[in-house]
């Protein structure tokens, strides 16, 4: 399926790209997939975009508009919404969840530098997720962050797959070496910043062979926390992405990677294959124990073992940070936090915590703003008028109450929470579901009732 045309449509406060494809005339329009359009979200799944006359040119964010909005002087509708909803409240700014702030484009163009400088001047709480040693060890950037070290408004997650240089060069082609990335941790830890070893992704069959040295070197470099998530495989991938599966399989030690993931992944989660808890348990156990024994925070972005997160932030951000309390300003209105609380309550008191939709997702204006929900890409049969009125609260409520949805809490967390009733709003009530591993770990003396 080839892309036929891409049209940019400016409709304040959002920008929309309409994508038409050949053969069945699918469209990605106004934030939704229509007429059975299929997965044009990811670069790896877009072979038709490569060397194509229809390919969009890579452009940077408008740094001035973003800086103006962060500082309370937005120049457009989108900026005003973001300021009133997030920036004014100094909501944690996560930079690097989708695009690395330390990529080589930044080294060449320096657009991000101006934004980083503004974030420092505003004392704005910011979390960087990066592999970009060429940027974050560059004298220009090091000097910038040294300037703001006393106010401690920045935190740094450094992403690693393996500590073995040869293996890393095969899996993370063109990425700075593990040694250089450890040096990022050391440099910014020495400045006094909150630093996190980000095991992303933890690849079973690869990461465990160097995990001991990686943990020890990261600890020696000064980490405050570790966050982890396991490699997952998208069964809906394009032919180009599937070629990568063939290439990756022998590095992991399997013949057929899709078949391996299909066999060992819970079907309740649909086509995005995540290995089951039993496969992941020994790996999580090692990292969790390491954190507990060394006074580190533990975060889990994986749906399995998310309950073990010690602060309620899957990124392992602090929940108590006297150096700059602004770094604590991440939302508690998400299931990672509530699973953590349920685990803590169970292992401290023996009580089974219950979770209600109205308590997990409380009154926050961003849940009820239809403009913001336009950022959420979904497949829907809604007409355009209903889609324009759709909010995150409605989306979340549908997932919450639809036991057939892959995003339903019971399915997404693979039984870690189970429905136990219906409340006065006709929303399902879920309860924490203790699992056998918790008893085993507790008997071994592993602390589960702490933070």
Predicted feature locations:
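Short acidic (Asp/Glu) and glycine-rich catalytic loops that position anionic groups and cofactors
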Residues: 28, 41-48, 262-268
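Autoprocessing domains of the Hint superfamily
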Residues: 1-36
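Short connector loops/turns at beta-strand edges and beta->alpha or beta->beta junctions
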Residues: 24, 42-44, 161-165
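Generic beta-strand/beta-sheet core signal
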Residues: 20-22, 30, 35, 129, ...
């Amino acid at each position: 399926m080839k892309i036929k045309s891409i049209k940019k449509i400016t409709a304040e406060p959002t920008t929309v790209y309409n994508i038409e494809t050949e053969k069945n005339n699918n469209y990605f329009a106004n934030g939704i997939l229509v007429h059975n359009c299929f997965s044009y979200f990811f670069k790896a799944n877009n072979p038709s975009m490569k060397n194509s006359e229809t390919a969009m040119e890579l452009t940077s964010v408008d740094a001035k508009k973003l800086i103006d909005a962060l500082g309370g002087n937005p120049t457009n509708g989108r900026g005003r919404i973001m300021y009133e909803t997030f920036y004014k409240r100094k909501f944690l700014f996560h930079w690097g969840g989708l695009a690395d702030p330390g990529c080589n484009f930044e080294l060449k163009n320096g657009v991000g530098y101006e934004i980083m400088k503004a974030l420092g001047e505003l004392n704005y709480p910011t979390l960087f997720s990066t592999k970009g040693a060429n940027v974050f060890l560059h004298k220009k950037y090091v000097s910038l962050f040294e300037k703001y070290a006393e106010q401690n408004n920045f935190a740094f997650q450094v992403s690693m797959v393996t500590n073995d240089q040869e293996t890393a060069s095969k899996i993370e082609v063109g990425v700075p070496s593990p040694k250089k990335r450890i040096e990022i941790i050391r440099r910014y830890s020495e400045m006094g910043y909150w630093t996190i070893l980000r095991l992303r992704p933890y690849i079973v069959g690869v990461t465990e062979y160097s995990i001991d040295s990686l943990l020890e070197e990261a600890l020696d470099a000064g980490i405050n926390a570790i966050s982890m998530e396991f490699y997952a495989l998208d069964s809906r991938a394009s032919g180009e992405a599937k070629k990568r599966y063939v290439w990756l399989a022998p590095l992991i030690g399997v013949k057929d990677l899709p078949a391996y993931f299909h066999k060992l992944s819970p079907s309740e989660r649909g086509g995005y294959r995540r290995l089951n808890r039993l496969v992941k348990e020994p790996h999580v156990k090692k990292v969790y124990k390491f954190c507990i024994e060394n006074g580190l925070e533990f975060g889990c972005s994986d749906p399995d073992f998310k309950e073990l997160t010690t602060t309620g932030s899957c990124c392992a951000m602090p929940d108590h940070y006297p150096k700059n309390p602004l770094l604590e300003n991440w939302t508690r209105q998400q299931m990672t936090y509530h699973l953590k609380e349920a685990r803590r309550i169970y292992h401290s008191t023996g009580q089974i915590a219950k979770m209600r939709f109205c308590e997990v997702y409380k009154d926050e204006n961003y849940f009820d703003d239809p403009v913001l929900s336009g950022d959420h890409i979904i497949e829907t049969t809604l007409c355009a008028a209903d889609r324009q009125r759709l909010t995150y609260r409605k989306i979340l409520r549908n997932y919450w109450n639809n036991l057939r949805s892959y995003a339903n809490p019971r399915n997404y967390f693979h039984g870690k929470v189970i429905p136990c009733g219906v409340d006065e709003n006709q929303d399902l009530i879920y309860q924490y579901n203790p699992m056998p591993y918790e008893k085993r770990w507790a008997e071994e003396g592993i602390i589960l009732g702490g933070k």
